[in-house]
Amino acid sequence: MAGLSEIQATTWEYREKKPADAVADNIPLLFAMRKKGRVLTINGGRVIWEDIKYAQNNYVQRIDPTEEITLGYNQTITGFEYSPKIIVVPVVVNALEKAQNQGDAAFLDLLEQRNQVAEDSLMNNMETDLQGDGVGFGGKAFAGVQSYIVTNTTAGSYGGLARSAYSSIRNVAVNAPTTFTGSTDSSNIESRLRYSKNLVLRNGGPELCLAGATYYNAACDAMSAKQRFTQNQEMFEAGFDNVVIEGMTMVLAGGKSFSGGARIAADRCYGIRLENFALKMYKGFNFQPVPERVSVNQLVDISITVGIGQFTCNGAGLSFVMHDS
């Protein structure tokens, strides 16, 4: 019997007591940020700051024993300024549903199930934002990797700093067919990734490679052919298929998207040094429910989960994008 209402699906007896999940998407970037400890809580503030040491001290000198030292100052430290964004998801239950979904008939808690769907829906949307460029939903979206790691590295700005003025905040962008010859496939993706990673190498390189389907499939084929297919066990056990290539954990950016949220293009990948990025959320609004509300003129209870913060970057100079188009 199709088309059951939520109250029917959660209250009727003699049913499988675990609903199938046709809501949760593949959310590899959000998972990786959490495991790296880059989802942080901040305590207030009008804006969110990230500091960066962006320039060399220009007064390093080699001198003779009696030579006069030239004294001077040049600015070496500055900051990025980010405006917070807000994302919410409401859950509503009315008095009739609460009355029906109780006692022996309530083998599934209706409110709990709705809250789980709401949480999954919220995380799906956050993954969409984190993989995006921050301009979606009329500019209300959180910033994403494409806000900071761009294909035109001298244009635009982020955090109030112009890429044209600060070369140290620019990521590396490699147009694969232009830099090399032909499209990227299993026969050449390893060497192309090595080239791209080496351009940003410093005490190790990017640890996460967020890849579109074409690049991800090519990497899997390349590693399988060489019998060198290894995986990040922690991500695999959490349900995120991956392949380790050139020292980076490459994960599929797309996969199944029940929400229909956009993901990065199939023929590109982002080499991300996670320590330079953070999802900074205000205390008390870290994807948490605010106090439950009761309508004054309706028999409904309302729970609203709120996230207020921003996806920030303290410099994309150690990350790269490689793309075929």
Give the ranges of each region predicted by the language model.
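Flexible, glycine/threonine- and acidic-rich loop/arm segments that mediate assembly and lattice contacts
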Residues: 1-325
